């Protein structure tokens, strides 16, 4: 971190909205946050207690639910504070560093994890007989660990490039969280090189992951079309549809914010809601409502709890 920074705290402007909407927005985002945490905790619990879900697909889903739960926790509580009172908009310099790091750490790890999950679906559908041996427990653990380590490295680059610059004057961040683009606008130095490296870094991660996901699904579609039974094709498509929905809801807003020329603070703040608030909620909804195995496990857990309480 830069030793020449004079700024000790930043002010988050919060989500762009009319002043009279503070209370309604606070209520809405609080409900969404609680549902996000409870929904992802439910998925973690269901997969943990149901032995039928101890498969590679659900192993990666537990990682995704864990990430989403904390990804939402890194961003939403502070956003709620900005809606409660003006003092809630203040964030210390070091807290801002921490939020930026964990925001990119969890976000990029999720990006890498989506890529691994698409590869897992490709192997399951294209090589059903060899799938178990190809996705062994050790390989699953290696792939999951790689996503976390890659996310950590990516986040370290973003954080160092952002806060290595001096901040000696303006301290108002035009966002509801500490993110690199709005923070760099406050630096008391030339940021062109930093912005270029950050742009290339995010571009390589986002475009690389998305390209691999697209290639996986092109191969999956080709494999599905070779399935002779309509029931088999329907089940394969249903399995992949959930993943496709979540991937699109995550990648499209990210690409819009980080990889388009120019930046509009108001538009970026609104679009960021999709992947910081809605996507973590969408994951448990999509994977429970569209997944028969998860729904069956949830009902089984409910019956088990009801039976234990009735005794």
UniProtKB/Swiss-Prot annotation:
Recorded coiled-coil stretches: none
Side of membrane Cytoplasmic, spans: 45-52, 120-138, 217-236, 290-311
Any one GO biological process: detection of chemical stimulus involved in sensory perception of smell
Pfam families per record: 7tm_4
Transmembrane segments: 24-44, 53-73, 99-119, 139-159, 197-216, 237-257, 269-289
Subcellular location field: Cell membrane
Natural source organism: Homo sapiens
GO annotation, cellular component aspect: plasma membrane
CDD domains xrefs: 7tmA_OR10G-like
Superkingdom of origin organism: Eukaryota
Extracellular side: 1-23, 74-98, 160-196, 258-268
GO molecular function terms listed in the Swiss-Prot or TrEMBL record: G protein-coupled receptor activity; olfactory receptor activity
Protein name according to UniProt: Olfactory receptor 10G9
Sorted UniProt keywords: Cell membrane, Disulfide bond, G-protein coupled receptor, Membrane, Olfaction, Receptor, Sensory transduction, Transducer, Transmembrane, Transmembrane helix
Main localisation: membrane
Annotated function: Odorant receptor.
Keyword Transmembrane recorded: yes
Disulfide bonds: 96-188
Family statement drawn from the similarity comment of this UniProt entry: Belongs to the G-protein coupled receptor 1 family.
Topology in membrane: Multi-pass membrane protein
Cross-referenced InterPro entries: GPCR_Rhodpsn (IPR000276), GPCR_Rhodpsn_7TM (IPR017452), Olfact_rcpt (IPR000725)
């Amino acid at each position: 971190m830069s030793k020449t920074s004079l700024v000790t705290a930043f002010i988050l402007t919060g989500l762009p909205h009319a002043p009279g909407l503070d209370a309604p927005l606070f209520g809405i985002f609080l409900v969404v946050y609680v549902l996000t945490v409870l929904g992802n905790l439910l998925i973690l619990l269901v997969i943990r207690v149901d032995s039928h879900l101890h498969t590679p697909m659900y192993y990666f889903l537990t990682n995704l639910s864990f990430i989403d739960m904390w990804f939402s926790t890194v961003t939403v509580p502070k956003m709620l504070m900005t809606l409660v009172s003006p003092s809630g908009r203040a964030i210390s310099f070091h807290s801002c560093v921490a939020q930026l790091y964990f925001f990119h750490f969890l976000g990029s790890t999720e990006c890498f994890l989506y890529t691994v999950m698409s590869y897992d679906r490709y192997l399951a559908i294209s090589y059903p007989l060899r799938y178990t041996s190809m996705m062994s427990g050790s390989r699953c653990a290696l792939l999951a660990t790689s996503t976390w380590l890659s996310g950590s490295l990516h986040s370290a680059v973003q954080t160092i490039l952002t806060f290595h610059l001096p901040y000696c004057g303006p301290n108002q961040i035009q966002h509801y969280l500490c993110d690199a683009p709005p923070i760099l606008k406050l630096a008391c130095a030339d940021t062109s090189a930093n912005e270029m490296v950050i742009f290339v870094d995010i571009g390589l991660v986002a475009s690389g992951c998305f390209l691999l996901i697209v290639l996986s699904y092109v191969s999956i579609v080709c494999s599905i079309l070779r399935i002779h039974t309509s029931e088999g094709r329907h089940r394969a498509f249903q399995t992949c549809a959930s993943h496709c929905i979540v991937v699109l809801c995550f990648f499209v807003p990210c690409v819009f914010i980080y990889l388009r020329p120019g930046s509009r603070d108001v538009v970026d703040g609104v679009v960021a809601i999709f992947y910081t608030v809605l996507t973590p909620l969408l994951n448990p909804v999509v994977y429970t409502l569209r997944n028969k195995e998860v729904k069956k496990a949830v009902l089984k857990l409910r019956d088990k709890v009801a039976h234990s309480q009735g005794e």
